[in-house]
Amino acid sequence: MKKITLVLLMGIALVACKKNKSTSDCGNKMCTEEFVMTGIKFADKNGAGAEIKDLSVINQRTGEKLYAKSSASISTVKGYYVVLDDANKLQLSEQGDDLKITGTSITTNQTKSAIVKVSGGKCACHISRISGAEQITFD
């Protein structure tokens, strides 16, 4: 009975390995279980958080409009908006993509944009912010 159970478990393990063949292209990677998010702060001319409307994140490589996919994208810090999270990593290249982030101030109706470079990809454990503004300030 023990031999049958052992053979059955080995068979299941082999089938599981074959189903995960697509991830084997990435080599042996150890990833953490954290969930990474990246965002941007919109501020008024005094540096205080500014509420915005019409938040837009456009991948400049693909033209695709991106949205943070997690329910954690709602921020409790005024003016800070989560724009992407690990659920978006397959929409990004490993080299990093330029993302045009745009928002319109509710107070002044002024629209401002910034470019932020974020990487991801099939083999990435998490998204990673490479460069770009961390704050957009309205006049």
Label each PLM-derived region with a short phrase.
Residues 46, 61-63, 107-109:
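Solvent-exposed strand-loop boundary residues in beta-sheet-rich modules
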Residues 41-50:
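Structural motif
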Residues 32-34, 93-95, 108:
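Solvent-exposed loop and beta-edge segments used for protein-protein assembly and interaction
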Residues 16-37:
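Bacterial Sec-dependent N-terminal signal peptides
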Residues 25-29, 109-139:
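Extracellular beta-sheet/turn segments enriched in Thr/Pro/Gly and aliphatic residues
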Residues 1-20:
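Sec-dependent bacterial lipoprotein signal peptides
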